[in-house]
C-alpha cells in the first residue's frame, strides 16, 4: 500500500513541491541486483522509477540513513515533483549533516559514507 500512497502524494504536489520521507531502516544492505523492498539507498530510485512508470515526473534529490547510536536508524529521502526543478534546488541536508551513511544525491550514482554493503544476499 505504501507504493500507492507515494504515487498519490507525488500526484497532488504542485510542480516543484517537495516530499520528505522518513522511515525506519535496519538490517543488512545487499544488492542482488538491487535492494528496494526495504528503505535502503535503492529504495528512493525504485520509487522514482515507479512514479515515472505511472506517468509522474519525480526526482530524488537526496536520501540517506540517519545513524542512531541506539540502533533505530531512519531512512530519509527528499523527492521533488517535476525533475526540471531539481537543478534549481541545490541545498541538501547531507551537505550539513555528518551522522549518516549510504547517502545519495541527485545527479550521482555514488553512495556516500557507504556502510553495510554486503556482496551476498542477507
Model regions and ranges:
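A structural signal for well-ordered alpha-helical segments within the folded catalytic domains
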Residues: 3, 7, 41-46, 73
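Core SAM-dependent methyltransferase catalytic element
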Residues: 68-122
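Active-site rim elements
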Residues: 30-35, 62-66
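Conserved Class I S-adenosyl-L-methionine
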Residues: 32-57
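Conserved SAM-binding loop
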Residues: 1-29
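Conserved S-adenosyl-L-methionine
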Residues: 53-69
Amino acid at each position: 500500500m505504501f507504493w500507492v500512497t507515494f504515487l498519490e502524494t507525488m500526484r497532488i504536489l504542485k510542480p516543484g513541491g517537495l516530499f520528505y520521507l522518513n522511515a525506519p531502516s535496519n538490517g543488512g544492505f545487499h544488492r542482488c541486483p538491487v535492494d528496494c523492498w526495504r528503505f535502503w539507498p535503492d529504495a528512493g530510485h525504485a520509487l522514482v522509477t515507479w512514479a515515472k512508470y505511472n506517468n509522474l515526473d519525480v526526482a530524488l534529490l537526496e536520501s540517506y540513513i540517519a545513524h542512531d547510536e541506539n540502533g533505530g536508524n531512519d531512512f530519509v529521502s527528499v523527492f521533488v515533483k517535476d525533475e526540471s526543478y531539481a537543478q534549481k534546488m541545490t541545498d541538501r541536508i547531507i551537505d550539513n549533516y555528518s551522522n549518516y551513511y549510504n547517502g545519495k544525491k541527485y545527479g550521482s550514482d555514488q553512495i556516500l559514507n557507504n556502510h553495510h554493503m554486503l556482496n551476498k544476499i542477507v
